[in-house]
Amino acid sequence: GFLGSLLKTGLKVGSNLL
């Protein structure tokens, strides 16, 4: 769903910032 992909994108960006 939309929220699932949004969460995945958030984790991806978050790990990139770290």
UniProtKB/Swiss-Prot annotation:
This protein's record includes keyword Secreted: yes
Protein name, entry field: Antimicrobial peptide 6
GO biological process, one term: hemolysis in another organism
Modification Leucine amide, positions: L18
Keywords: Amidation, Amphibian defense peptide, Antibiotic, Antimicrobial, Cytolysis, Fungicide, Hemolysis, Secreted
Keyword Secreted on entry: yes
Function: Has antimicrobial activity against Gram-positive bacterium S.aureus and Gram-negative bacterium E.coli and strong activity against yeast C.albicans. Enhances the antibacterial activity of XT3. Has strong hemolytic activity against human red blood cells.
Compartments where located: Secreted
Tissues of expression: Expressed by the skin glands.
Entry's Gene Ontology cellular component terms: extracellular region
Highest classification ranks of the organism: Eukaryota, Metazoa, Chordata, Craniata, Vertebrata
